[in-house]
């Protein structure tokens, strides 16, 4: 047996031996637009009988965020026994938007106002994954309503929920399964909500970070070792799901599983990522799978579909150079693998639809495995943020109609790149962007930026 075959077999054995929760084909569904995502959220909130757990990066104090929060309060008022917990990032909730000089109010101050007026006990929990937001955030995903999971990388604001003209496109999968829902709720209760390092964000006084320091070390240590608890089966012949999580580079089960998916591939992989900024390990695995003849399609947002992109008619800020930096990464990658790009073995698909933005993440592997995750496949997700994912094993391709429909929807707004020259380079960029990138390269600051953003 060759070393290549051995690596493939070892990786497949790892994936086959993961403990899985069997799924009924009828219990899985997919939504195909941000508008239907918002409608589904509101429906599920209204229908929930005993628990609602929402995990996201943030809940914004805008019209769409208000629709969600007020729906939660209405549900609690109608059913006081309903347990409602929203888990978001502690730091993100207490600052203004990027670029705001001084925030007069924050999301947290809005939560406090609403709770003061309503007084119903909807709990909004802030999770400080690291002491500073720059070095790691709460990036767990998933919304649980009784026994129903709605999994998406989206947060709650006008653009994610398509409140106005613009939308931010994500993935939206529904799974009805008691074991999976219980496991996800148990994880949140045991690892996060019961921790002394988290703080209620809608009480009169929010515990400052200085008072959370001692408990915070324990939280970080625990999250690095945390696992979902459930009774699973080591099966490889039926539709099933494995919940995964990870924080940091050591013993990170989610990162390890992503690598095993790439290393196990024999026919075809599709990767979705909003920012083309791959960790070294992923780049290496991609190089190896291309070398062994696996077809690879990467769907990535055009620089103008990046949530950091600043339109030309708006005042420019340094953070607006990021989408250009990611495009230089993509151009370098396309140049490195030019032969495979031109032969069609490698397909780079740039997503662009009007003024909308792209936030999809995940993988399809060999028409069998599908990874749903908030993991951006970038160094930040690899090393700094706490992440989770749902690995769906579909050996009989029972979800193929849904996956095909989702793919069709995604690829409808993509441009196929067949040559690196189709991508702009530094020389094509506006002068103010060019200066920033050249200066960053000269001081090697671009490496630091790529590692943390």
Where are these regions (language model features)?
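Generic beta-strand/beta-sheet core signal
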Residues: 55, 87, 145, 152, ...
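Gly/serine-rich nucleotide phosphate-binding loop at the start of the catalytic core
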Residues: 58
């Amino acid at each position: 047996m060759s070393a290549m075959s051995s690596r493939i077999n070892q990786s497949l054995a790892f994936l086959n031996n993961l403990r899985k929760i069997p799924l009924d084909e009828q219990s899985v569904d997919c939504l195909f637009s941000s508008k239907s995502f918002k409608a589904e959220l509101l429906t599920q909130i209204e229908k929930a009988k005993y628990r609602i757990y929402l995990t996201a990066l943030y809940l914004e104090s805008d019209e769409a965020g208000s629709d969600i929060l007020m729906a939660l309060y209405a549900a609690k008022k109608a059913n006081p026994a309903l347990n409602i917990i929203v888990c978001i990032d502690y730091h993100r909730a207490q600052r203004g938007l990027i670029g705001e000089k001084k925030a007069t109010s924050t999301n947290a101050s809005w939560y406090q106002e609403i709770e003061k007026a309503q007084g119903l006990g909807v709990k909004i929990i802030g999770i400080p994954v690291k002491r500073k937001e720059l070095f790691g955030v709460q990036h767990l995903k998933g919304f649980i309503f009784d026994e129903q999971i709605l999994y998406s990388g989206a947060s709650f604001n006008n653009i994610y929920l398509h409140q106005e003209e613009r939308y931010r496109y994500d993935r939206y999968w529904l799974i009805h399964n008691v074991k999976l829902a219980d496991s996800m709720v148990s994880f949140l209760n045991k690892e996060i909500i019961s921790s002394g390092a988290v703080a209620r964000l809608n009480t009169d006084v929010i515990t400052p970070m200085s008072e959370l320091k001692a408990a915070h070390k324990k939280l970080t240590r625990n999250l690095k070792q945390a696992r979902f608890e459930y009774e699973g089966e080591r099966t490889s012949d039926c539709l099933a799901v494995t919940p995964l999580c990870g924080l940091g580079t050591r013993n990170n089960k989610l990162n390890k599983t992503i690598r095993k998916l790439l290393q196990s591939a024999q026919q075809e992989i599709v990767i979705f990522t909003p920012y083309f900024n791959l960790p070294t390990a992923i780049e290496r695995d991609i190089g190896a799978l291309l070398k062994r003849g696996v077809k690879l399609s990467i769907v990535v947002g055009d620089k103008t579909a990046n949530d950091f992109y600043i339109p030309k008619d708006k005042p420019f800020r340094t953070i607006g150079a990021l989408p250009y930096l990611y495009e230089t990464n993509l151009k370098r990658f396309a140049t490195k693998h030019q032969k495979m790009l031109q032969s069609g073995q490698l397909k780079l698909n740039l997503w662009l639809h009007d003024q909308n933005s792209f936030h999809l993440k995940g993988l399809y592997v060999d028409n069998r495995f599908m990874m749903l995750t908030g993991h951006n496949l970038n160094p930040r997700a690899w090393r700094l943020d706490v992440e989770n994912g749902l690995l769906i094993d579909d050996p009989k391709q029972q979800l193929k109609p849904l996956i095909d429909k989702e793919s069709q929807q995604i690829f409808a707004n993509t441009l196929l790149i067949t040559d690196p020259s189709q991508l702009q380079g530094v020389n094509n960029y506006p002068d103010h962007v060019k200066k920033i990138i050249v200066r960053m390269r000269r001081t090697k600051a671009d490496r630091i930026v790529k590692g943390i953003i």
